[in-house]
């Protein structure tokens, strides 16, 4: 008898989502991060954005602790040559996000994953799970 193989869903968590998660503002964000049915990935650029964001209001120690926790909750994906090339293609196709957002999108696409975000730059893209918010 052949066993059934469970295919897990992979999500790339972007900076907006991590910020909302740690701020505790949007409960829908928690569903994706805390539900262990999903494989979570985070672009290494998201870590840079998180440190930059957190350093505005938090201590360096807190910023590093949060980045460490992100690394525990998700697989941190470095920017490979393939991701960089694909990101360039995303910009050519008209994606209006900045370079970091473009690399996050390419990270998801190269792994056949879905970006989880509420960032308006991503709204309407087919490989994005957009979280509506006020």
Can you annotate each of these PLM segments?
Residues 39, 75, 129-130:
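Conserved beta-strand segments of alpha/beta enzyme cores
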Residues 1-42, 53-68:
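Short, well-structured N-terminal submotif of metal-dependent ribonuclease cores
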Residues 2-9, 105, 109-134:
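Acidic, PIN/NYN-like endoribonuclease modules and their adjacent C-terminal/linker elements
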Residues 13-16, 42-44, 96-98, 119, ...:
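Histidine- and aromatic-rich ligand-binding microenvironments
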Residues 17-18, 46, 83, 103-104, ...:
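Alpha-helix capping/helix-boundary segments
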Residues 76-118:
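Active-site neighborhoods of divalent-metal-dependent phosphate/nucleic-acid chemistry enzymes
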């Amino acid at each position: 008898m052949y066993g059934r193989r469970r295919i897990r869903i992979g999500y790339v968590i972007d900076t907006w989502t991590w910020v909302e998660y740690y701020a505790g503002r949007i409960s829908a964000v928690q569903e994706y991060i805390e539900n262990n049915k999903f494989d979570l990935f985070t672009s290494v650029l998201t870590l840079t954005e998180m440190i930059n964001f957190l350093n505005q209001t938090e201590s360096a120690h807190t910023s590093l602790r949060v980045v460490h926790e992100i690394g525990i909750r998700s697989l941190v994906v470095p920017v490979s040559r393939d991701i960089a090339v694909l990101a360039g293609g995303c910009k050519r196709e008209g994606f209006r996000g900045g370079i970091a957002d473009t690399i996050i999108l390419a990270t998801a696409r190269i792994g056949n994953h879905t970006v989880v975000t509420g960032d308006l730059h991503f709204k309407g893209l087919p490989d994005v799970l957009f979280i509506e918010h006020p």
